[in-house]
């Protein structure tokens, strides 16, 4: 009888220890580095608190997010207008950079009009 009492007491202590918060796996939220669908490496999600006493931490977290956007070139690394070129800008000779000296491989306007008809 004394052995079974000790066994029950021992099992009760083990079960009470197994239910402590320290032994349970804690969900720490989304963290770590991951890839998005385009294959870009994304950093961990920074928790931004709205408490007044953590305003400085919130500001530094926002600064880090701004730096990530600058590094990744988000939302655009340059304005969309800069990517659109005229035909002349596209075929300017690279070594001169002069708009009036075109590359020899550029088809003449007459040749393109003749091929369309």
Curated annotation (Swiss-Prot):
User: What subcellular compartments does it reside in?
Assistant: Secreted
**Membrane-spanning regions, if any?**
none
Q: Look up the signal peptide feature and give its range.
A: 1-23
GO CC terms for this protein?
extracellular region
* One Gene Ontology biological process: behavioral response to starvation
Q: In which tissues is it expressed?
A: Isoform 2 is found in brain, thymus and skin. Isoform 2 is found in the skin, in pericytes covering microvascular arterioles and venules on their abluminal surfaces. In larger vessels, isoform 2 is expressed in layers of smooth muscle cells. Isoform 2 is not detected in endothelial cells.
Keywords of the record, alphabetical order, are: Antibiotic, Antimicrobial, Cleavage on pair of basic residues, Hormone, Neuropeptide, Secreted, Signal
Prodomain residues? 86-117
Task: Identify the Pfam families for this entry.
Answer: Galanin
Task: Report the InterPro entries cross-referenced here.
Answer: Galanin (IPR008174), GALP (IPR039244)
Q: Name one GO molecular function term.
A: hormone activity
Q: Which PANTHER family match?
A: GALANIN-LIKE PEPTIDE (PTHR20950:SF1), GALANIN-RELATED PEPTIDE (PTHR20950)
UniProt lists the family membership as follows: Belongs to the galanin family.
- Name the chain's protein: Galanin-like peptide
